[in-house]
Amino acid sequence: MARLAGVDLPRNKRMEVALTYIYGIGPARAKELLEKTGISPDLRTDNLDDDQLSALRDVIEATWKVEGDLRRQVQADIRRKIEIGCYQGIRHRRGLPVRGQRTKTNARTRKGPKKTIAGKKK
């Protein structure tokens, strides 16, 4: 089983799809990565040789933050916004949607289950 950036890539998937299992690499970045390394997108993960695997590893480490580093960076950005007290930081602190979505209805994922108020009738 091929292992890149601390993630076991699925054996029987095409490389284009298998690379998206790494946090921080989506379909577009996977295509770009395969073009840089000259690996066919249709190649299966279990058909990779060691040279191709090391080429992928080198390009990923040199070019992008992925997995743990990226997760830490995102959390640090959120903490910084909370500390400086900007609008997005306040929304994070209150557990509300950050990017301008409506909250009168919807937003249940972010707000959690409904809190019923006793004595409120129509």
Curated annotation (Swiss-Prot):
Domain of life: Bacteria
Molecular-function GO term, any one: structural constituent of ribosome
Coiled-coil residue windows: none
GO terms classed as biological process: translation
GO cellular component terms given for this protein: cytosol; small ribosomal subunit
SUPFAM superfamilies registered for this protein in UniProt: S13-like H2TH domain
A Pfam cross-reference name: Ribosomal_S13
Region annotation Disordered: where it falls in the sequence: 95-122
Alphabetical keyword list: Ribonucleoprotein, Ribosomal protein, RNA-binding, rRNA-binding, tRNA-binding
InterPro entries: Rbsml_uS13_C (IPR027437), Ribosomal_uS13 (IPR001892), Ribosomal_uS13-like_H2TH (IPR010979), Ribosomal_uS13_bac-type (IPR019980), Ribosomal_uS13_CS (IPR018269)
Function: Located at the top of the head of the 30S subunit, it contacts several helices of the 16S rRNA. In the 70S ribosome it contacts the 23S rRNA (bridge B1a) and protein L5 of the 50S subunit (bridge B1b), connecting the 2 subunits; these bridges are implicated in subunit movement. Contacts the tRNAs in the A and P-sites.
Annotated family: Belongs to the universal ribosomal protein uS13 family.
Record's subunit section: Part of the 30S ribosomal subunit. Forms a loose heterodimer with protein S19. Forms two bridges to the 50S subunit in the 70S ribosome.
Protein name: Small ribosomal subunit protein uS13
